[in-house]
Amino acid sequence: MLILFVEYHTAFRQAASYMLDQEVDLVVVSQASSVAEGREKMAQGGIDTAIVDIPLPDEGASELVRDLHEANPSVPVLVMTHIEDEAIHKKFVEAGASEVLPKTMTYEEILAAVRRLGDELLR
C-alpha cells in the first residue's frame, strides 16, 4: 500500500514513516508538513491511502481531506489527532475521512487501522 503522510511535526512524521516502511506491505511514498504541501503531493498521484494529522499549521485540514476524497473516492483517508472533540471528528468524517483516530493509540493499533483501510481497497 502506497501512503501519503501529512504531519507537521517533522520528527513524528519521519519516525512514523520509517516504522511503516519496515512493514512488507506498506510504503510511505510521500510526506508533507502542511495542507499546501499535502495538496502538491496529492496532485502527483500514486497513493493508495493518506494519513493526515490534525491540526496542521496552515488552515484547511478538513478541506485537504475533502480534496483527497473528491479527487479519488477509493483512496481512504485516515485522520489522526490529539483533539478529543466529537464535533471535530464528525466534521472530518463528513469531509471524507474513513476514520478519525486518537494519537494516543499504540503503533500496533495504528498499523491495524491502516491495514483495515487497505483491505477495504481490495474489496
Q: Which residue ranges define each predicted feature?
A:
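Conserved phosphotransfer cores of two-component systems
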Residues: 43-45, 68-74, 95
